């Protein structure tokens, strides 16, 4: 997945500004928070708002069908879906009424200049 996202975010030239992103991760046990963090970095580097939920967007399960038994994870996904839909509608309305925020020309530095 990371290889695909590298290609999509660094090699493609379509504007991703103000397109809503949301990461969803699934694991047997540990590793969700680190993966969630890594995936969200793609959105933040591309001027994309991130939809959130009531907890990190993760669900747990090892084998086929096990994730469907994670009640808290399923609730997190439902809340995420509603929040993402609201955020997308809000951005569309704001864009229609106020336009997009003014873009600045990107300045490249090496942390000291």
What function would you assign to each model-found segment?
Residues 49-113:
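Glycine-rich phosphate/pyrophosphate-binding loop and the adjoining helix
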């Amino acid at each position: 997945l990371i290889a695909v996202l590298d290609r999509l975010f660094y090699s493609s030239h379509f504007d991703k500004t103000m397109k809503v992103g949301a990461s969803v991760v699934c694991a047997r046990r540990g590793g969700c928070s680190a993966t969630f963090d890594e995936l969200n970095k793609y959105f933040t580097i591309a001027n994309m708002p991130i939809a959130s939920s009531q907890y990190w967007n993760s669900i747990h399960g090892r084998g086929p069908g096990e994730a469907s038994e994670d009640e808290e994870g399923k609730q997190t996904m439902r809340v995420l879906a509603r929040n993402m839909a609201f955020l997308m509608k809000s951005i569309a309305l704001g864009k229609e009424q106020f336009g997009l925020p003014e873009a600045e020309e990107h300045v490249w530095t090496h942390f000291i200049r």
